[in-house]
Amino acid sequence: MAAKDVKFGNDARVKMLRGVNVLADAVKVTLGPKGRNVVLDKSFGAPTITKDGVSVAREIELEDKFENMGAQMVKEVASKANDAAGDGTTTATVLAQSIITEGLKAVAAGMNPMDLKRGIDKAVVAAVEELKKLSVPCSDSKAIAQVGTISANSDETVGKLIAEAMEKVGKEGVITVEEGTGLQDELDVVEGMQFDRGYLSPYFINKPETGSVELESPFILLADKKISNIREMLPVLEAVAKAGKPLLIIAEDVEGEALATLVVNTMRGIVKVAAVKAPGFGDRRKDMLQDIATLTAGTVISEEIGLELEKATLEDLGQAKRVVINKDTTIIIDGVGDEATIQGRVAQIRQQIEEATSDYDREKLQERVAKLAGGVAVIKVGAATEVEMKEKKARVEDALHATRAAVEEGVVAGGGVALIRVAGKIAALKGDNEDQNVGIKVALRAMEAPLRQIVVNAGEEASVIANQVKAGEGSYGYNAYSEEYGDMIAMGILDPTKVTRSALQYAASVAGLMITTECMVTDLPKADAPDLGAXGGMGG
């Protein structure tokens, strides 16, 4: 076992604070509308330029082991805030740095660290309650655009794109961000249910100019099995041909003579057919087939529930207004499913989301809800160079997380104003003893830090502006972008309540642990043994 280096008391805390400051100082230059960029060196390829706090934090490793421990703990604050709300990482880091710095000063002055922590926790609990009271629901498109704009570092086009996407696919819809091909940002919206499976044979194509299959008001056969024998399908094919409508077959697979016969029927124009594989694998495939059945008012033909393909009738088939299939995707538009049944299915999946333990499962379930309830929007980010593309894509993703958080828990005045108002409201809060009161003061002072940092980054005098904002009330604050005072909500400077709340809670949680640290243990660096020198008589 390697030998350890141990530091106690003030020695340990000073080292830890130095690490905290290195990381926080690198992150906090990005805060606010006039925040600067940070350039990150990569082991290969061009450097990355970012204004995203958590991306900067993740890159930082310090040589000194004790300092690095301090830096890593603050990195945890940024990561946790990012996981919870997808944004607010820089705010969380600034809050943590302030609480740790002020807290360690109090510890050095002889206060009891545990009571300080209790005081800080007490203040944060009260502050979160006040934040909830200040929160305003964020429902209209304009407010959503404003939140997106602020989070994308005052880029209005991004805010508008996100608001437009949310309007089209609903609050539940899936919105994804991809790298575009041109210079302009674009928004693609897919109405209806889309899944990643294309036609099984190019002979089904009936729109050669677009290379796709289009079926108008088709019947939809859903089978949870492989179809290789055409005899199983004859009754359904005959019934569909009589009805004079096209048929879409979604099955585990269609192969051999069954596929060949379908192709021949299509080419001769006897019955218009297209076949695709069912989306997903295993149990997820069964669930997705059931989703499509709900959407199109059909039944999944599955031997598990005693249904056989030979006995299927037109009543078992789903229907939709239109189906478009290309080589990679299938889109079912306007299924005839009953709205109440679809909502019931959505509620059932939501319940599974609540119970899901892994992020992957949760994401897949949310996609299913979106496909049933809203639709899918893709924001394609345009830029002139690869470096700009990466930076912009990260900003758009941040803005998307922020707008989601805003829709979830509402918004408060931005620019650090909400925390100043909250601190004003709980200024009279008292702890059980004097040391707890100092802890409360440490937390209250930290709540000014985000506003001060935004102002510093804008090149103004922090104390003057902080006092002016404190003297105002409600959503009165300082707009660092236009350098004027006014009503932040009216000026469209909004922060999602969830982002501000998460930043404060995670910052206080980690900072409280660091203030109560009394000892730090790390491995001693291994001393490299010197090379063996040349022995006597070995001269060339």
Swiss-Prot record:
Catalysis performed (reactions): ATP + H2O + a folded polypeptide = ADP + phosphate + an unfolded polypeptide
Chain positions recorded as ATP binding sites: T30, L31, G32, P33, K51, D87, G88, T89, T90, T91, G415, D495
A GO term, aspect molecular function: isomerase activity
Signal peptide, first to last residue: none
GO biological process entries: protein refolding
Localization annotation: Cytoplasm
Keyword Membrane: no
EC number(s) from the headed UniProt entry: 5.6.1.7
GO cellular component terms given for this protein: cytoplasm
Location, primary (coarse class): cytoplasm
Source domain of life: Bacteria
Keywords of the record: ATP-binding, Chaperone, Cytoplasm, Isomerase, Nucleotide-binding
Family matches, as InterPro entries: Chaperonin_Cpn60_CS, Cpn60/GroEL, Cpn60/GroEL/TCP-1, GroEL-like_apical_dom_sf, GROEL-like_equatorial_sf, TCP-1-like_intermed_sf
Residue stretches in coiled coil: none
Subunit annotation: Forms a cylinder of 14 subunits composed of two heptameric rings stacked back-to-back. Interacts with the co-chaperonin GroES.
Protein family according to the UniProt entry: Belongs to the chaperonin (HSP60) family.
Function: Together with its co-chaperonin GroES, plays an essential role in assisting protein folding. The GroEL-GroES system forms a nano-cage that allows encapsulation of the non-native substrate proteins and provides a physical environment optimized to promote and accelerate protein folding.
Protein name from the UniProt record: Chaperonin GroEL
